[in-house]
Amino acid sequence: MAAGSVGVFATDEKIGSLLDQSITRHFLSTVTDQQGKICAEYVWIGGSMHDVRSKSRTLSTIPTKPEDLPHWNYDGSSTGQAPGHDSEVYLIPRSIFKDPFRGGDNILVMCDCYEPPKVNPDGTLAAPKPIPTNTRFACAEVMEKAKKEEPWFGIEQEYTLLNAITKWPLGWPKGGYPAPQGPYYCSAGAGVAIGRDVAEVHYRLCLAAGVNISGVNAEVLPSQWEYQVGPCEGITMGDHMWMSRYIMYRVCEMFNVEVSFDPKPIPGDWNGSGGHTNYSTKATRTAPDGWKVIQEHCAKLEARHAVHIAAYGEGNERRLTGKHETSSMSDFSWGVANRGCSIRVGRMVPVEKSGYYEDRRPASNLDAYVVTRLIVETTILL
């Protein structure tokens, strides 16, 4: 199935891209002198909590840390994050990445969002107040409290590529289904490894940007892929995961395909998409007591199972059915090397008496700030 055409005005799959990207590539490759200035692409989470927004500004100096960057604002009424009569939302830079699209000294900036600054009676500025969709703020507070425990994370981000016109998985027969699952996971070859170009370009661009991406593989559902981000410590997990998604959206824009983070994109006897979250602390990584600490963590996670499930991704009930390598949504379980459990512990952890474990409950549309905050709260702070 062709993936070449996209756009609100396109109705025929054979229509080419509305914009000729070869022209864009020509000029971007030949025009390299920016007269000592750089482009900074400010990136933030939009009002749906799934979309990622961005806009650019020109800087005269190259920042070395987020604090060197100016705060900015945007029209929150156009992103579902503010009313029209008081529409300004403020952006505070938090993490800097290289811009793999523009190259050179240009940068991508992960930001979080705040209400406009308020002035105290004494004329000083009050501390910025996060808007409701700013989940990074609470996560940063929790990670600061737990930093002595050195929480490490690695998230497995599954996604499905869709034809931008039909909204059907890339490479699937129009209005039909491919052969059953089996030949697609970690596959190679035409007809089974569908969408590798997208996965490979995304992989390389994340590396170039400085996103701590650690691997890529084709998944069980045809046109479904996974990439892994981590290990990342504390708040950096959320920053790197959200920037990796921004880069994915940009790559799919270039290929005129859509990416879906829906946890069950195709109903029926097909695998869903997860955001399995691997986790360890200094205590779990230290033998011989690490294995005991992991078991204590599992007991704590069981006690707050309902709290975690409620925040682990919209539509997750369609995925967590106890089938297709998932646990039951209503029941907590953990086990060694068991992919049908809520928590999977690696085979060597009981042997080595230390290590990490995998929370398999989060959906592919997870908010990494929310999931990592909850895990640390439950296992360390409560």
Curated annotation (Swiss-Prot):
Entry GO terms, CC: cytoplasm
Molecular function (Gene Ontology), one example: glutamine synthetase activity
Residue ranges annotated for the GS catalytic domain, each copy included: 135-382
Keyword Cytoplasm on entry: yes
Catalytic activity: L-glutamate + NH4(+) + ATP = L-glutamine + ADP + phosphate + H(+)
Keywords attached to this entry: ATP-binding, Cytoplasm, Ligase, Nucleotide-binding
Gene Ontology terms describing biological process: glutamine biosynthetic process
GS beta-grasp domain sequence ranges: 36-118
Pfam families: Gln-synt_C, Gln-synt_N
Broad enzyme group: ligase
Domain of life: Eukaryota
Compartments, record wording: Cytoplasm
EC number: 6.3.1.2
Additional remark text: Irreversibly inhibited by the herbicide L-phosphinothricin (PPT).
Family per record: Belongs to the glutamine synthetase family.
Quaternary structure, from the entry: Homooctamer.
This protein's name: Glutamine synthetase cytosolic isozyme
Native organism: Chlamydomonas reinhardtii (Chlamydomonas smithii)
Name of the gene this protein is made from: GLN1
